[in-house]
Amino acid sequence: MTNSGKTGGKSGKGGTGGARALKVRVKTARKRSNSSTRWLQRQLNDPYVHAAKREGYRSRAAFKLAEIDDKYRFLKPGGRVVDLGCAPGGWCQVAVARVKAEGGDAGAEGRHGRVIGLDYLEMDPVPGATILQLDFLSEGADDQVKELLAGEADVVLSDMAAPTTGHKQTDHMRIMSLCEIAAHFATEVLAPGGTFLAKVLRGGTENELLVLLKQHFKTVRHVKPKASRADSAEMYVLAQGFKGRSESPLDDAE
């Protein structure tokens, strides 16, 4: 985690541009495993890691959100955003800039944006955002968020990932379960017409989540931004046009 606290660029476009850098090779140290060496080498050679440092983002993941929003335009000036599992804060930085949460031009409804980040981990403040050290599963968390927003949210974001085990199917099931829980929370706090964006892993059950979300959102799709590593099973589910709360909660829908 950095202490820069910068909002960073507003779009992430061209963030990896410039002259091509020489690749760094890392020797395996005596107390460093081969997998750790590969991870370190990948980080040192990752253009998005360098771009994040250059533009003041706390993580390379900021470019994933920026790229998705560049195409689908759901982070609008004046918007109210909830970021679940927000540490270290890269997505909050992007959201703050795009919804004008630090000031600037107000949105279409004459209001400035609002960004609420939730994480059970302690983290440095993000200028322009309200950070709560809170488990979003705790009782009353949804009501607390709506109170801080002075209404319902326009966007709910989740870049959360469950701790990995190294077993692909287990990791897939864990993150899909986490995504479903986040989706249920989203249906409790979103305003009609709202957007839900969450990380998932390919593994066999991701289409079941699409079917479930289509009952509550007008448009549901999978997206994979260029900032997601090509060899990763990671992708995102983007659900737009929330239909509003029904009598049947999302997790009871079939």
Swiss-Prot record:
- Active site residues of this protein: 199
Q: What broad class describes the main subcellular location of this protein? A: cytoplasm
SUPFAM superfamilies for the chain? S-adenosyl-L-methionine-dependent methyltransferases
Q: Which annotated residues bind S-adenosyl-L-methionine?
A: 89, 91, 119, 135, 159
Task: Give one GO molecular function term.
Answer: rRNA (uridine-2'-O-)-methyltransferase activity
Q: Gly residues composition bias: which ranges?
A: 1-18
Quickly give the catalysed reaction: uridine(2552) in 23S rRNA + S-adenosyl-L-methionine = 2'-O-methyluridine(2552) in 23S rRNA + S-adenosyl-L-homocysteine + H(+)
Compartment(s) of residence: Cytoplasm
**Region entry Disordered: which residue ranges?**
1-26
According to the UniProt entry, the coiled-coil residues are none
Q: Which GO terms describe its cellular component?
A: cytoplasm
Instruction: State the InterPro entries in the record.
Output: RNA_methyltr_RlmE (IPR050082), RNA_MeTrfase_FtsJ_dom (IPR002877), rRNA-MeTfrase_E (IPR015507), SAM-dependent_MTases_sf (IPR029063)
Q: Which UniProt keywords apply?
A: Cytoplasm, Methyltransferase, rRNA processing, S-adenosyl-L-methionine, Transferase
EC numbers? 2.1.1.166
Q: What does this protein do?
A: Specifically methylates the uridine in position 2552 of 23S rRNA at the 2'-O position of the ribose in the fully assembled 50S ribosomal subunit.
**Annotated HAMAP family:** RNA_methyltr_E
Q: Which family does it belong to?
A: Belongs to the class I-like SAM-binding methyltransferase superfamily. RNA methyltransferase RlmE family.
* Name of the protein in question: Ribosomal RNA large subunit methyltransferase E
